[in-house]
Curated annotation (Swiss-Prot):
Disulfide bonds: none annotated. Keywords: Aromatic hydrocarbons catabolism, Lyase, Manganese, Metal-binding. This is 4-hydroxy-2-oxovalerate aldolase 1. GO terms for biological process: catabolic process; L-leucine biosynthetic process.
Amino acid sequence: MNLQGKKITVHDMTLRDGMHPKRHMMTLEQMKSIACGLDAAGVPLIEVTHGDGLGGSSVNYGFPAHSDEEYLGAVIPLMKQAKVSALLLPGIGTVDHLKMAKELGVHTIRVATHCTEADVSEQHIALARKLEMDTVGFLMMAHMNSPEGLVGQAKLMESYGANCVYITDSAGYMLPDDVRARLGAVREALKPETELGFHGHHNLAMGIANSIAAVECGATRIDAASAGLGAGAGNTPMEVLVAVCDRMGIQTGVDVWAIQDVAEDLVVPIMDFPIRIDRDSLTLGYAGVYGSFLLFAKRAERKYGVPAREILVELGRRGMVGGQEDMIEDTAITLAKARASKAQKVAA
């Protein structure tokens, strides 16, 4: 595997996916401090929004400390070389949110759908291209679709105007061979000028290995987060990815030492709990469950007395996907009733 001289764009997730473990309560000062550190370290693209994207502030997903406008308005003017991106999920974010992001100076918009629902992205992708934004299609929970199925979905996004398409391992479920099969097929099917990206999670400790496998397959954009701050066991840890790429001769443009300092000095101190592979986040990866379900399942555990792991396994069995957060509590109630019924039978 010789990737010497290969150039990739490292895309930071700390200030968007990292909002999940922060319960979307990151302060403006924290946001600005980390963004400036990433910018100074040479990170070229930084995502800033609610964890569930533009318009994510809601009862279903959680209310943030500040609005998307406030976060973006605070960060964008401070950037010296980095561009800022925003995530948008059709059905949560609207075309008005997209226009607002453009007006504030957002460079890249990533339109995200479930890996079988690319058709709902047409309006937003088409508008983003009309606004001359760097326009990315983002296929989530990619392990739930076959390589052939993902090819069809990626080509739809490309036809709407996406100049880059992401294969997204939202559950941290995929192994390197899964990544190669999917990204290899999609890379072959897309136009040569359409970029390919990969977004990984570290629930099975595969974040780095999967990202390198993606680069092997022609991916030129790779997502990562400082100190791994993200949903579940976190995203691919940025400082480790940059170091591995440096060892392999893959060019990121990110300073190996400065990015470590961002993680240690700025990100780790604001963590509400350690981002690590505990039994619940491991279960996310093993059972193929959407990463941001983790804290919802932990809350349901406290409320109904059903272990989060048991809830997550059941969610995986049911094939629940992002957007069905309201079903987590329903699942916990069902499991609690089943436990109570079983206990009564044993007692009898």
